[in-house]
Amino acid sequence: MTVIASELSAAIRSIPDYPKPGIIFRDITTLLGNPRAFRRAVDELVQPYAGTKIDKIAGMEARGFILGGAVAHQLSAGFVPIRKKGKLPHTTVRVAYSLEYGVDEMEMHVDAVQPGEKVILVDDLIATGGTAEGAVKLLRQMGAEIVSACFVIDLPDLGGRKKLEDLGVDVRTLVEFSGH
């Protein structure tokens, strides 16, 4: 583990048996509340793209809004919120995506991304990859070029990274936690 990964993982609270027995919930609110760790995480998410023309950062509800907004600011890019169905006020495009126990839908405004725009997808964590896969499909449906998908936390045992890589998406993460 790198020094940066060690610093960031120390700022993330682990809550056993939440939301159900056998699951360890990785809570980034402690990282967000620590100014040094929050800045370090944003700087590390931004660093690979410094000097690269990125048009939009797409953040997934809800923690992806916090991280994605900060990354968009640093890269002088626009921000696109990807939300659960029914939460956006203007005309939207929608896609169904798989959850661990079923299917849900996410959407974004129809005019949020233009064909050919370079987009980075940002969220706090990738687990099974179902939500991120849905966001990738939604962005591609609108003609976006997905430069990368970036996450603070990867739970590699759950296969989300591979799911996105199989779609041809570059995946970048800052910290890995084994198990669930």
Curated annotation (Swiss-Prot):
Task: Please name the GO terms that the record assigns under molecular function.
Answer: adenine binding; adenine phosphoribosyltransferase activity; AMP binding
This enzyme catalyses:
AMP + diphosphate = 5-phospho-alpha-D-ribose 1-diphosphate + adenine
Write the gene name: apt
Q: What Enzyme Commission number(s) does the record list for this chain?
A: 2.4.2.7
Query: Gene Ontology terms, cellular component aspect?
Result: cytoplasm
Q: Which InterPro entries match?
A: Ade_phspho_trans, PRibTrfase_dom, PRTase-like, UPRTase/APRTase
Q: How does it assemble?
A: Homodimer.
Q: Which UniProt keywords apply?
A: Cytoplasm, Glycosyltransferase, Purine salvage, Transferase
PANTHER family, alphabetized: ADENINE PHOSPHORIBOSYLTRANSFERASE
Xref: Gene3D superfamilies: 3.40.50.2020
Similarity comment: family membership: Belongs to the purine/pyrimidine phosphoribosyltransferase family.
Localisation per UniProt entry = Cytoplasm
What is the documented function of this protein? Catalyzes a salvage reaction resulting in the formation of AMP, that is energically less costly than de novo synthesis.
Q: Which domain of life is it from?
A: Bacteria
Q: What is this protein called?
A: Adenine phosphoribosyltransferase
Q: Which NCBIfam families match?
A: apt, PRK02304.1-3, PRK02304.1-5
Q: Name one Pfam family in it.
A: Pribosyltran
Coarse class of the primary localization is cytoplasm
Q: Name one GO biological process term.
A: purine ribonucleoside salvage
Task: Note the PROSITE patterns from the entry.
Answer: PUR_PYR_PR_TRANSFER
Q: Which species does this protein come from?
A: Agrobacterium fabrum (strain C58 / ATCC 33970) (Agrobacterium tumefaciens (strain C58))
